[in-house]
């Protein structure tokens, strides 16, 4: 039996508590010079964007950096497949979140015919070694697959069609992916079989309930990265210096102001 979906107030209370901890994690990552990669994969409409927004809502974009690469350029198509992702990897004190990642090759590219079966198979063969190299370079890698049901995906796609506030979310691959449900399922299973390793495991997140999925992901991230409290010096707000004071409000007279409509 499905659990009752979380109500707004209960969700916001839990979310805020987890976001406070994410701010502590952020300070620790910066203080210790850690390098973290968190990647999100899943079918279209699985809730990747909303989950990433919940993570980044109250943290610094200088520490948490979101990467959502467009389709490769003609030049990038001639490069090693993971090359454009390597350029986005974190330096010390950074957490990089991939909204889709190098696993595009195992999913959307393969299913929609943007790569050959041979290219997909070669990717699945070499990617565990690539991820092992990331670990050996000091990067902590977390891989999440958001699993949405056929019924829920249909509801979300229909909302993208009908709701003007969501129509921008409807991509060129959404509708074709809808007709290829089982092809995506087989591609997912092949990806797991080849790349769900002991060193770099996949974590599956049921995402029909968006709110619970977001909370579960945030909680899991905090459990996967040990962090402590960073000592902070007591800060005293300084007074405004009156040296060279002048009427700075009067100096704005005659400038263009945004109309105070509200």
Language-model features and meaning:
Residues 1-262:
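Glycine-rich phosphate-binding loop of ATP-dependent small-molecule kinases
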